[in-house]
């Protein structure tokens, strides 16, 4: 995120009423309590550089890239991780196992496995309303994310949609056989977001 946006966030937090409460002690088990280990992990997996706009991309695409890779941090959930918890670059936006242990986070790249048959309007509409073009609704951990996305301007949601559609298409990071086994256990169908060509009647085509 930009320094200016971080300052704005701090200013907003400072404007909130103070709350007096007991804060539990900060405790982490081994090996996560080794601070030097966290520093090494940061060197391996955290890019501390500020966002640099692509001079060859449109203002809309650059705005979408900033929102998706910065405050939106979409790769944190929609990418697989290695044994150290670092994001596997080849799986960025291509989905991941859910951290709870069952189910998978969907592939949101414009591939056949992902949301290749969604339009930019479909994606923007999902962010605004929580409704997918496949007559489904956002649920579970994505629900509060969508509620926050609905607070964005229409232009920002459109920018996010444009950037998502510009991503390189990738196959599912979670094998479909594993997705099916997990869905069978949960008694539901996979909600990959690309299983149906049907469009929501209220989405502008």
Model region roles, listed by residue range:
Residues 81-87, 117-122, 132-140, 171-182:
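Extended intrinsically disordered, low-complexity coil regions enriched in Ser, Thr, Gly, Ala
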Residues 39-69, 112, 183-205:
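Electrostatic cytochrome c docking/interface patches
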Residues 1-4, 91-132, 144-158:
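Electron-transfer interface patches adjacent to heme c in soluble/periplasmic c-type cytochromes
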Residues 9, 64-67, 71-81, 123, ...:
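The canonical Cys-X-X-Cys-His
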Residues 1-59, 65-67, 81-82, 150, ...:
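Hydrophobic, ordered structural segments
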Residues 25, 103, 137:
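Residue-level signal for pocket-adjacent positions within structured domains
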Residues 41-62, 108, 115, 125-135, ...:
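C-type cytochrome heme-c attachment and multiheme electron-transfer modules
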């Amino acid at each position: 995120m930009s320094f200016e946006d971080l300052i704005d966030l701090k200013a907003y937090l400072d404007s909130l009423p103070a709350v007096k409460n007991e804060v539990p002690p900060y405790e982490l088990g081994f090996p996560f309590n080794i601070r030097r280990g966290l520093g090494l992990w940061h060197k391996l997996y955290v890019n501390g550089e500020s966002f640099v706009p692509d001079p060859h991309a449109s203002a809309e695409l650059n705005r979408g890239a900033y929102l998706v890779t910065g405050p939106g941090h979409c790769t944190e959930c929609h990418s697989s991780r290695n044994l150290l918890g670092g994001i596997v670059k080849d799986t960025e936006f291509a989905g991941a196992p859910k951290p709870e242990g069952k189910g998978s986070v969907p592939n949101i790249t414009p591939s056949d496995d992902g949301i290749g048959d969604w339009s930019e309007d479909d994606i923007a509409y999902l962010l605004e309303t929580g409704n997918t073009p496949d007559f489904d609704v956002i649920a579970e951990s994505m629900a509060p994310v969508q509620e926050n996305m609905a607070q964005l301007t229409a232009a920002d949601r459109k920018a996010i949609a444009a950037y998502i559609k510009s991503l390189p298409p990738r196959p599912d990071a979670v094998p479909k056989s594993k997705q099916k086994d997990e869905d069978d256990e949960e008694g539901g169908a996979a909600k990959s977001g690309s299983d149906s060509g049907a469009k929501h009647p209220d989405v502008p085509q």
